[in-house]
């Protein structure tokens, strides 16, 4: 019985120890949770106050939104100087009632906007020049096509004129040869050679052709004889 009682007592002590440890752990956890909630609530209150812009932004006049006069003064200063020195920045901030850091940030943003504007203007100029170059290229290509067409037409006209000139020359030479053969012209070995019966053909007279008295030629005589050359010519053509 004593041993049984000791075991029960030990079990009770262990159970009480476990219960105490569990209660302590739960108490610590429960104690931390409200603190975390309170911190979150405080942060929410701070965020809410800053979001409204009434207390946080309104409390510090240097962090308020810039007025039109302040912006105009900053723009004038930016036109004079793109980047302010430290003394100039502090002096301008004191004149406008702003924080020097706020003035420095404004100038930094203004330089970035100015650079972006310059890049946009440069891009616009380059794009305009590129479009003009493409248009000029199209005009040149059209002009090249027109010149090629004119060249083809000119080459065809040259070929036509050459062929026409060649055919005209060939026909002219053939006509000259035929005219010489049918006209009965005399062909001599040299310009000073006399007439010969072998190379000259007398003109033919048809049956209707008749020589009258008026067609006869009187040949004067010299020393009882006529001119031998004239007589020879008339006798050649059967006139005497």
Swiss-Prot record:
Assigned keywords, A-Z: Coiled coil, DNA-binding, Homeobox, Nucleus, Transcription, Transcription regulation
Domain of life: Eukaryota
Segments of the chain annotated as binding DNA: 59-118
Composition bias, Basic residues: 35-44
Gene3D superfamilies associated with the record: Homeodomain-like (1.10.10.60)
Segments forming a coiled coil: 108-167
GO molecular function: DNA-binding transcription factor activity, RNA polymerase II-specific; sequence-specific DNA binding
Tissue spec. comment: Expressed in roots, stems, leaf blades and panicles.
Gene Ontology cellular component list: nucleus
Spans annotated as Disordered: 26-64
GO BP terms: positive regulation of DNA-templated transcription
Composition bias type Gly residues, residue spans: 46-56
Localization of this protein: Nucleus
Known function: Probable transcription factor.
Similarity section: Belongs to the HD-ZIP homeobox family. Class I subfamily.
Protein name: Homeobox-leucine zipper protein HOX14
Gene from which this protein is expressed: HOX14
């Amino acid at each position: 019985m004593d041993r049984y009682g000791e075991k029960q007592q030990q079990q009770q002590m262990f159970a009480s120890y476990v219960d105490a440890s569990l209660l302590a752990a739960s108490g610590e956890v429960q104690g931390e949770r409200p603190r975390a909630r309170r911190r979150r609530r405080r942060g929410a209150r701070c965020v809410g106050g800053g979001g409204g812009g009434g207390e946080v932004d309104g409390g510090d006049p240097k962090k308020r939104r810039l007025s039109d006069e302040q912006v105009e003064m900053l723009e004038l200063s930016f036109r004079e100087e793109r980047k302010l020195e430290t003394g100039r920045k502090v002096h301008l901030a004191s004149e406008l009632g702003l924080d020097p850091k706020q003035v420095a940030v404004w100038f930094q943003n203004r330089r970035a906007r100015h650079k972006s504007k310059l890049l946009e203007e440069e891009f616009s100029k380059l794009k305009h020049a590129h479009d003009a170059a493409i248009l000029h290229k199209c005009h040149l290509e059209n002009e090249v096509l027109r010149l090629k067409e004119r060249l083809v037409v000119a080459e065809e006209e040259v070929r036509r004129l050459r062929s026409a000139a060649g055919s005209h020359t060939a026909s002219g030479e053939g006509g000259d040869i035929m005219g010489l053969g049918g006209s009965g012209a005399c062909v001599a070995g040299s310009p000073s050679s006399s007439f010969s019966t072998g190379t000259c053909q007398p003109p033919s007279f048809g049956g209707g052709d008749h020589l009258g008295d008026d067609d006869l030629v009187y040949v004067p005589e010299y020393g009882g004889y006529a001119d031998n050359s004239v007589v020879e010519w008339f006798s050649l053509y059967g006139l005497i």
